[in-house]
Amino acid sequence: MRRTVLLLATMALTLLVASGVALAVNKIGTNGPDTLRGTNGADNLVGKGGNDSLIALRGKDNLLGGEGKDILWGGTLRDSSVGDKTLVGGPGNDSVLGGKSSDSLSAGAGNDFMVDGEYRTAVKDNLSGGSGNDVINVINVKPAGKDVVSCGSGFDRVLADRKDVLAPDCEKVRVVHGTLDEQDEQEQSWFATIPESFFEGLHRI
């Protein structure tokens, strides 16, 4: 009987995968360094302790880094990152990178690096830096989405579009304008002022 049930369950799973139905996962890391990757479903990825890398794919995903110097990525170069994401870094110097959809990004305590979307899309994201000296980049190509940024305590630096809504607690703000080439030049100039330590470990993805 148990073999029959197992066989039927295996057949059902095979049919779901073959039909393209997205299956969600829940993955929880350890107190050491972990790499957790999502699926095309709605996933929950929890890093816990250690310097973790959490990578979302399609689906409405929730990523929680926990303690440590974590990297949270709302989508990779190999997928379209469909589905709104919620990314929470937690304590530690985290890198929180949004995807193509309207994401909610929260870095937590620590000196964090945040980007609203690697793909420069025109959706609206909500970003919260938390405590610490954060670096936040929310520029997009036109038509830009109206991103909402709260920096929190600490000395924070923000690169933004004219449409973005920035809280008064963002200490150093630079607003870019002009053509895409001009925006790229301004962005490169701005990044040159950021300490290299903010970008250490990004090769883990």
Protein language model regions, located:
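Positively charged n-region of N-terminal signal peptides that target proteins for export
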Residues: 1-4, 9
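Bacterial N-terminal signal peptides
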Residues: 8-17
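Sec/Tat signal peptide C-region and signal peptidase I cleavage site
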Residues: 19-26
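Glycine-centered beta-turn/loop sites at beta-strand termini
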Residues: 29-32, 38, 47-49, 56-58, ...
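Thiamine diphosphate
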Residues: 113, 135, 190
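Leucine-rich solenoid repeat scaffolds
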Residues: 138-139, 143-181
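Composition-driven, intrinsically disordered low-complexity tracts enriched in small residues
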Residues: 183-205
